[in-house]
């Protein structure tokens, strides 16, 4: 990557100052199972493009993709710069014992803490792309059918197994009554009268996740859906109402096609509710009032934000993607992926001569040369000089 020149002050006009991007070295990528190709290969390409060598650990949960990656990648890539390691938590733990130059992990906050703890042993820098409970506020002035279309699409996409999917809706009881029939209409239009047979609705990744999600169906009251089929690992697109903050469905990231609705009376109450929780990976607000959307944006914190829209921003390579606080640290996508896997090294190349010009920097310092230094360095009052 070409170096990036940077501006200088008067005393450095003869110097060359630039940012040199160099590879970290050996990078460990621990990939997730929900989008096992995209969330593996995007990172692999970024790390290799930055010049690093990669140890790639695909998720053992998406077994088919794990096997394909292990078999196909060595056929097309130089094996001296990467390795694919198969296995489960034990193998991942063994990898984390080694001295690495960078770790990129995508997964749950619980495992993210394990990864970060292991990284501290060698002070290894990390990017953690974690999850969270993503709120979706719906204002009373919204058209319920428009909201239903957009929320149902990005809630049930990939059977809800998406880290930026809405985890719950916040709205007034009045909006809930208008929203429920609209959601039912949308679900039928998207997936038909028998969603289980729809080619447009995904199923749950494995039995463990299925059992976890089916247990959540017992929370609150099922207003839409609620059906399940263990042999098919099918959970119907579901909406829960009368949901309390203390219930299990509100205590963990759902990561499935279940949408709880929590009642609030105002945008202020919604914001207070959101700010009582950990910072989410994404936050959504629907309102015909730009003031309401801006309030939600300005008075909360999240990895990303969508006003009157879902997670379509993740398709853009021009903006970074990442969490904040409990939902992660670091960023990637597009050039940001390259930058994540690069050490940004500040470089200054000065002439070997011209010593007379440098003497102004040396002690003893008089009032005159201090004034000259301040003038030559500009108004950088927070620098050493």
Curated annotation (Swiss-Prot):
Tissue: Salivary gland. Expressed at protein level in placenta.
Record propeptide residues: 383-385
Alphabetical list of Gene3D superfamilies matching this protein: Aldehyde Dehydrogenase, Chain A, domain 1 (3.40.605.10), Aldehyde Dehydrogenase, Chain A, domain 2 (3.40.309.10)
Modification(s) after translation: Geranylgeranylation is important for localization to lipid droplets and enzyme activity.
Residues bearing a lipid moiety (S-geranylgeranyl cysteine): 382
Superkingdom of source: Eukaryota
Modified residues (Cysteine methyl ester): 382
Subcellular localization, as worded in the UniProt entry: Lipid droplet
GO molecular function terms noted in the UniProt entry: 3-chloroallyl aldehyde dehydrogenase activity; aldehyde dehydrogenase (NAD+) activity; aldehyde dehydrogenase [NAD(P)+] activity; long-chain fatty aldehyde dehydrogenase (NAD+) activity; medium-chain fatty aldehyde dehydrogenase (NAD+) activity
Name of the top EC class for this enzyme: oxidoreductase
EC number(s) given by UniProt: 1.2.1.3, 1.2.1.48
UniProt: NAD(+) binding residues: 107-112
Entry annotated with the keyword Lipid metabolism: yes
Family affiliation: Belongs to the aldehyde dehydrogenase family.
Name of the featured protein: Aldehyde dehydrogenase family 3 member B2
Recorded name of the encoding gene: ALDH3B2
């Amino acid at each position: 990557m070409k170096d990036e020149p940077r501006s200088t002050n008067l005393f450095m006009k003869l110097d060359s100052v630039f940012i040199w991007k160099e590879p970290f070295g050996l990078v460990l990528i621990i990939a997730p199972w929900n989008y096992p190709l995209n969330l593996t290969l995007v990172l692999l390409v970024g790390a290799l493009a930055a010049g690093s060598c990669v140890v790639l650990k695909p998720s053992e949960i998406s077994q088919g993709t794990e096997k394909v990656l292990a078999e196909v990648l060595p056929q097309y890539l130089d094996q001296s710069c990467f390795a694919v390691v198969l296995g489960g938590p034990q193998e991942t733990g063994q990898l984390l014992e080694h001295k690495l130059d960078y770790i990129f992990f995508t997964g749950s906050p619980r495992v993210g803490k394990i990864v970060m703890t292991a990284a501290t042993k060698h002070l290894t820098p990390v990017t953690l792309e974690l999850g969270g409970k993503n709120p979706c506020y719906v204002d009373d002035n919204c058209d319920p059918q428009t909201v239903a279309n957009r929320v149902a699409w990005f809630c049930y996409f990939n059977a809800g197994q998406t880290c930026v999917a809405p985890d719950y809706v916040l709205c007034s009881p009045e909006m809930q009554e208008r929203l429920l029939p609209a959601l039912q209409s949308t679900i039928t239009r998207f997936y038909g009268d028998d969603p289980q047979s729809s080619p447009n609705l995904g199923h749950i990744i494995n039995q463990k996740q299925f059992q976890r999600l089916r247990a959540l169906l017992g929370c609150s009251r099922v207003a839409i859906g609620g059906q399940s089929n263990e042999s098919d690992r099918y959970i119907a697109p579901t909406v829960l109402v009368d949901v309390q903050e203390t219930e299990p469905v509100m205590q963990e990231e759902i990561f499935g096609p279940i949408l709880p609705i929590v009642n609030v009376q105002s945008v202020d109450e919604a914001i207070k509710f959101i700010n009582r929780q950990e910072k989410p990976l994404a936050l959504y607000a629907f309102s015909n009032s730009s003031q309401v959307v801006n309030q939600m944006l300005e008075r909360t914190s999240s990895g990303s934000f969508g006003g009157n829209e879902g997670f379509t921003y993740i398709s853009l390579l021009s903006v970074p993607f990442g969490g904040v606080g409990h939902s992660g640290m670091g960023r990637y996508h597009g050039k940001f992926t390259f930058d994540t896997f690069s050490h940004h090294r500040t470089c200054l190349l000065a002439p070997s001569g011209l010593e007379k010009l440098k003497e102004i920097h040396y002690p003893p310092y008089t009032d005159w040369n201090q004034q000259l230094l301040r003038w030559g360095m500009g108004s950088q009052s927070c620098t050493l000089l």
